[in-house]
C-alpha cells in the first residue's frame, strides 16, 4: 500500500485517540495525538497562572513528541515529559479555551503539518481534515451520543484514578461541543469529503475494522 495520511476528527470523547492508535498499529503507521499538544500548552498556561499573553507563551515554548515502547507517544514540554499530567480535570476544563487562541493554534498546526510531511501518519483532533491535513487520503468524522461519550470519559478517569461525576461530565462535554463548534479559529466541523462514523454502541474492534475497510478501498 502506498504511504497515506489519515485524519480522524470529532468532538470530545468520541473515541478518536483510542481508534487512531489502533488503526496506526494495524497499518504500521505513526500516530500523532494533536490533542496532547493543546493539553501541554494548557498545562503551561495553568502553570503560568492563566496568562493571557499567548503569543509570549508559545514563543517561549519548546514542544516535541517522542515515542517509547512502554508508553507510546510522550509529550516533551520545555524538556520535561508532561504526558502523565495532561488528562487531569483542570487541563481538561481549560483546553478548549487555550486551543481557541490564534497564537496557540498557529504554533500547534505548524508542528502538526511538519510531522505529516513525510506521510504515513494517523492524526486525530478537531480540525485535522479541514485545516491541518486538507489533502489527507482518508478523512473520518467520528461521532457518538453525549451519554456514551460521558460514560467513556468517566471510565477513563476511573482507570487514571481521577475523581469525576457522570452528570458533570455530560454537562462539560455538551459545553465543550458548543465551544469547539462556535469558536472563530478552526472550529470543529466535518470536512466536506469526510466519512461520518457513528461509534455509539460499537466496540473498539468494530470501529477499527470499519476504518481499515475504508483504507483498503484507497487506490
Swiss-Prot record:
Identify the SUPFAM superfamilies for this entry: P-loop containing nucleoside triphosphate hydrolases
**GO cellular component annotations, sorted alphabetically?**
cytosol
Molecular function (Gene Ontology), one example:
CMP kinase activity
Q: What is its main location?
A: cytoplasm
Record-level GO BP terms: nucleobase-containing small molecule interconversion; pyrimidine nucleotide metabolic process
Q: What is its EC number?
A: 2.7.4.25
Claim: Amino-acid biosynthesis is one of the keywords in the record: no
Residue positions annotated to bind ATP are: 10-18
Q: Which family does it belong to?
A: Belongs to the cytidylate kinase family. Type 1 subfamily.
HAMAP family reported for this sequence: Cytidyl_kinase_type1 (MF_00238)
What name does UniProt use for this protein? Cytidylate kinase
Q: Which organism is it from?
A: Staphylococcus aureus (strain bovine RF122 / ET3-1)
